[in-house]
Amino acid sequence: MPGADAPQHSAPAPTQPQWAAQVIDGYKIYGSADSEVRALDGITVGFEPSRFTAIMGPSGSGKSTLMQCAAGLDRLSQGQVFIGEVDISTLNEKQLTLLRRERIGFVFQQFNLLPTLTAGENITFPLDLAGRKVDQGWMDQVVTTVGLADRLTHKPSELSGGQQQRVAVARALVERPQIIFADEPTGNLDSQSSADILHFLRDAVDSFGQTVVMVTHDPVAATYADRVLFLSDGRLVDELMAPTKDSVLARMGALAG
């Protein structure tokens, strides 16, 4: 046995997973034989923690399918999906629902707000559903960041489209999720409201260390990301760091042939 004077070694500090989410050798196949369609065709991709990743590609390239499978909203036909260190491919539906509720935030093109609840109640609804206490200090910080402090008592019908999407972003942020998946979050908004939402998502990464993965067809929206992934025919075919509008347009033009 070591003597009394032997040095005491503390346990190593926990390390952050290399990827906030990861898809490994992922296939999503519809139909069979002559009618088989491979929406995802052996794709492997990881999403870094505390970074903003955009996913782009032509219509039918598999970008929304990739996001849905990575977020546990749909299942791969073959392959693995990890959220942090959890292989969600092995979870049953109840376990998967719980993981999504606890670890993942969502922002969709459709705002998906409950019309009978106020903006504030919509923001905290996922926490209420999970029986989790609202951190009022964090809630105040989030609603201030997205510019909703004076709109919390309004119903969705009393808010503009841009304001409703701000509620959706705040709802995702207030849960402190491990990762936020955003599917065309500015698709139904005017240019100014779109810029506001993208700024809030960017600020969530820079100020709060949030991880954001966004599907978009808009080259301007993609410039808010740290990294852009390009898909074609269900495969990852290119990526771009520190994107600009011109560099994104050039890559998309090359994919279009």
Sequence positions of predicted segments:
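Conserved beta-strand-loop-alpha-helix hinge in the C-terminal portion
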Residues: 235-257
